[in-house]
């Protein structure tokens, strides 16, 4: 009986964990680039969020929210809590939500006006931070 309960819970919770980490809500075949003003960097787990206000093609303000990596994942890519200043101009590259009515995306990277780029999940090999070779 105990082994059946353990099996049930393992199967049940593995589905929940998989759903949480699913990227099904995002169009992974499409990239969008949003230029705007950084209004929030939500530095928290399980995912950090970058919030940018941009102007749409009709001249209306649009607030975009981009889901990033965990804090540890961002730090491995060179991010810190103070990598950006609220109010600075940035360009965000992301995978859009499959629902075009949603101003929400999966973050690829953020580029500052200086040209410095911060990657969320992965980065080109030539720009990877050096690792201690001990």
Regions found by a protein language model. Give the residues of each.
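Short, structured beta-strand/loop micro-motifs enriched in basic residues and often containing a Trp
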Residues: 67-76
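N-terminal signal peptide c-region/cleavage motif recognized by signal peptidases
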Residues: 14-16
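Short nucleic-acid-contacting surface segments enriched for D/E, G, S/T with interspersed K/R
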Residues: 76-92
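Cleaved targeting-peptide boundary
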Residues: 19-27
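Extended, charge-rich, solvent-exposed interface segments
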Residues: 116-134
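Conserved hydrophobic positions within beta-strands
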Residues: 36-38
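Short aromatic-glycine-enriched beta-strand elements
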Residues: 44-54
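OB-fold/S1-family single-stranded nucleic acid-binding modules
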Residues: 97-122
């Amino acid at each position: 009986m105990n082994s059946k309960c353990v099996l049930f819970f393992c199967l049940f919770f593995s589905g929940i964990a998989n759903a949480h980490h699913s990227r099904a809500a995002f169009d992974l075949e499409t990239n969008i680039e949003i230029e705007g003003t950084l209004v929030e960097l939500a530095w928290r787990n399980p995912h950090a969020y970058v919030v940018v206000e941009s102007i749409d093609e009709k001249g209306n303000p649009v607030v975009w929210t981009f889901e990033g990596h965990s804090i540890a994942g961002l730090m491995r890519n060179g991010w810190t809590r103070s990598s950006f200043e609220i109010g600075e101009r940035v360009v965000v590259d992301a995978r859009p939500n499959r629902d075009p009515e949603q101003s929400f995306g999966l973050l690829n990277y953020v580029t500052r006006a200086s040209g410095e780029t911060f990657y969320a999940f992965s980065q080109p090999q030539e720009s990877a931070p050096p690792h201690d070779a001990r």
